[in-house]
Amino acid sequence: MIIKIHNQTSFCITPFKSLLIKMFLPIKEKKLMHLIFVTNEKIQELNSFYRQKNYPTDVLSFPNDLTFFAGLEDNSLGDVFISFSKAQVQAQTAKHSLEREIAFLAVHGFLHLKGYQHRTEEEFQIMLALQEKILQNVGLNLDKTT
């Protein structure tokens, strides 16, 4: 899978790029995904506008629906926005690495682009198992502090 990583924050994301590329490279997906690191203010703006929830969240996914809505061929799976600040706080709270939190959020966003949801317990468990599998491929686990 092809990913493009964009940084719209003042934080240095260079240490996380190789992990993210390594994590998504083996996934058999021919479309491009954009991972965009943003500020809490930006993600709150997006969350408010698109979901009518006026607070910052950790990750938002926006699938590319051009093919569906307009019948157009496009090579983009969609965009995943990650709040770097939110990831830092969540990693500290959960007592695991920022690397693991960013990887988790990126995978979570990717699965939403692929159509997975977690509205029910069954959907949640399916999504959790897929996240765990992808994270384990790069030596990260959901239940460990790494």
Swiss-Prot record:
Judging by the UniProt lineage, the source's domain of life is: Bacteria
Q: Where does Zn(2+) bind?
A: 108, 112, 118
Mind listing the GO molecular function terms for this protein? Answer: metalloendopeptidase activity; RNA endonuclease activity; zinc ion binding
Tell me which InterPro entries the record gives: MetalPrtase_cat_dom_sf_prd (IPR023091), YbeY (IPR002036)
SUPFAM superfamilies documented for this protein: Metalloproteases ('zincins'), catalytic domain
The places in or outside the cell where this protein is found are: Cytoplasm
Q: Which cofactor does it need?
A: Zn(2+)
What EC number is given for this enzyme? 3.1.-.-
State the UniProt keywords alphabetically. Answer: Cytoplasm, Endonuclease, Hydrolase, Metal-binding, Nuclease, Ribosome biogenesis, rRNA processing, Zinc
Enzyme class, top EC level, equals: hydrolase
Task: State the free-text cofactor note.
Answer: Binds 1 zinc ion.
HAMAP family, per this entry?
Endoribonucl_YbeY
Q: Which family does it belong to?
A: Belongs to the endoribonuclease YbeY family.
State the name under which the record lists this protein: Endoribonuclease YbeY
Q: Organism, per UniProt?
A: Onion yellows phytoplasma (strain OY-M)
Please state the gene responsible for encoding this protein.
ybeY
